C-alpha cells in the first residue's frame, strides 16, 4: 500500500553469547540471548542454552542438549500488502495498513445503489476487519438462504510466529564408524496464514441478521477480502 506514500518500517536487534568450560574441559556450557524490536511489534527476547559433555578416555562420546526459543516477524507483505487480484483483495494486517488501503468499487443497480447512496462506494481495509462475515458462513447462507447462519468475523492483528525447541544428541566414532543421533521437539505458536472473509459494500455485518438484504441483493455487492491473520489451530 505504498502507492500514495512510502511505508516507513524499521527493525533492530542485539546479540550476546557466553561460553564456559568445566570439569577439565569435558563439559562446555554456552548461553546466548538475542533481542529484536520491530516497529509494529513488542520486543522479542530469544534465549538459548546448550550443554556438551565429552565422555570416555579419549573423549569420543559426545552428549549434547539444548533449549532455545525463536520467532519470525511477519514479512512486509504480511503487514502491508494491498492488492486487488479480481476475485479477492489481498490485505496485510498491520494496524496502520487498514487505513492505508483504499479503493472505490461499483455497487449493483437498484437496491444496492439505493442502499449505498450512489453507484460506487469507497472501502478501506477496516471493512475486512470490522465489518465482514466468515467465508464459510456466507457459503452456508448462499446455499440455504438462512441469514441466521451468518457469522461476523473476529480477527486479531498478525503477530510474530514463535517456537520453543529442545534438542538432544549423541555423537561418537566407534570402530571406524561414525555415529550421530539427534532428536528434536518443537512447539509452534501463532502460525501466519491467509484467512478469507466476505465484506458487504454497504450495511452492517452482524451475527445472524434478521434481514439478509443489507449484505447485498443477490450477493451482487459482496466482496471477498483475503486477510493475513493468525492461523488458528
Label every model-predicted segment.
Residues 31-35, 51, 65-69, 78, ...:
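Transmembrane beta-barrel strands of outer-membrane/channel proteins
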Residues 25-29, 45, 59-63, 175-179:
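Outer-envelope beta-barrel architecture signal
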Residues 7, 15, 147-161, 165, ...:
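Outer membrane beta-barrel strand-and-loop segments of large Gram-negative receptors
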Residues 19-23, 52-56, 161, 171-175:
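Structural signature of outer-membrane beta-barrel channels/translocons
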Residues 56-158, 162:
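Outer-membrane beta-barrel translocator/channel fold
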Residues 5-52:
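Surface-exposed extracellular loop regions of Gram-negative outer-membrane beta-barrel proteins
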Residues 2-10, 46-50, 80-87, 196-205:
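Flexible, surface-exposed loop regions and adjacent strand-edge segments
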Residues 1, 11, 36-40, 68-74, ...:
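Structural signature of outer-membrane beta-barrel domains
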Amino acid at each position: 500500500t505504498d502507492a500514495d506514500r512510502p511505508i516507513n518500517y524499521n527493525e533492530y536487534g542485539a546479540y550476546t553469547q557466553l561460553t564456559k568450560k568445566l570439569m577439565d574441559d569435558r563439559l562446555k556450557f554456552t548461553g546466548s540471548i538475542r533481542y529484536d524490536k520491530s516497529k509494529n511489534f513488542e520486543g522479542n527476547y530469544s534465549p538459548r542454552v546448550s550443554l556438551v559433555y565429552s565422555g570416555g578416555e579419549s573423549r569420543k562420546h559426545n552428549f549434547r542438549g539444548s533449549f532455545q526459543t525463536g520467532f519470525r516477524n511477519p514479512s512486509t507483505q504480511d503487514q502491508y500488502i494491498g492488492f486487488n487480484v479480481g476475485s479477492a483483495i489481498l490485505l496485510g494486517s498491520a494496524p496502520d495498513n487498514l487505513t492505508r488501503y483504499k479503493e472505490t468499487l461499483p455497487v449493483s443497480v437498484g437496491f444496492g445503489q439505493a442502499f449505498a447512496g450512489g453507484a460506487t462506494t469507497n472501502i478501506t481495509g477496516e471493512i475486512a476487519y470490522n465489518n465482514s462475515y466468515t467465508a464459510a458462513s456466507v457459503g452456508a447462507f448462499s446455499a440455504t438462504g438462512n441469514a441466521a447462519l451468518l457469522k461476523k468475523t473476529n480477527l486479531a492483528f498478525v503477530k510474530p510466529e514463535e517456537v520453543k525447541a529442545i534438542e538432544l544428541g549423541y555423537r561418537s566414532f566407534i570402530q571406524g564408524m561414525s555415529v550421530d543421533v539427534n532428536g528434536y521437539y518443537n512447539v509452534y505458536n501463532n502460525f501466519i496464514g491467509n484467512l478469507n472473509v466476505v465484506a458487504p459494500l454497504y450495511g452492517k455485518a452482524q451475527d445472524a441478521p434478521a434481514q439478509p438484504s443489507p449484505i447485498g441483493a443477490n450477493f451482487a455487492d459482496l466482496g471477498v477480502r483475503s486477510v493475513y491473520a493468525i492461523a488458528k489451530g
